[in-house]
Amino acid sequence: MDVLRNVLGYDDADLDTEMTALGQRIDIAVKHNGKVLLVIELKNVRHKLPTAVREQAANYAASKSADWTVVTNGQVWKLYRIIPVKGHDPQIVEVFDIALFDDDGLSDNDIACFYLLTKRALTGSDSERRFHLKESLNDRRILAAINDEKIVKAMSKLLATTYRQENKVNVKLSSEDVRARLEDLFRPEDL
């Protein structure tokens, strides 16, 4: 609770430790203007954070119409964006997974991610922007972009041009050549 108050900027009125969801007590519900912003599921520092804990927190958050959930053992902090899906379990999208005081100490990335948990970031648009940035660059989208016909064609031209400049030899590369090489680099089902 001290971290939430002293580091992340929440007032006592923002923090609810008595709220229930799905017949269970929520460890901490972070509220703003009466709306639940964030559900925090706390575990002992000696415990790992398995998928079941993430799903439990996400279901609590969805039941309270909260967009965000955090699971933490104090050392590891994981922020998820919760997207309701009518008639199904909510979609859970990881925004970050950081370990405080690990081999890299308290890194700049840890600090930047931890900022996303602040009242300012959650009530403003910083956390939402970070979620959209991460989603726009997810593996599926990157692989789809790489495999787009225009990109493959541009890659074949660029590869042939740079090879010619470096080796003084003309090589004809087709889109099919590049696509075959991409399949070698990535699993075909990824493309």
Regions found by a protein language model. Name each.
Residues 71-72:
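Acidic beta-strand-to-loop metal/phosphate-binding motif
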Residues 1-68, 79-191:
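A short, conserved, highly charged catalytic patch centered on acidic carboxylates
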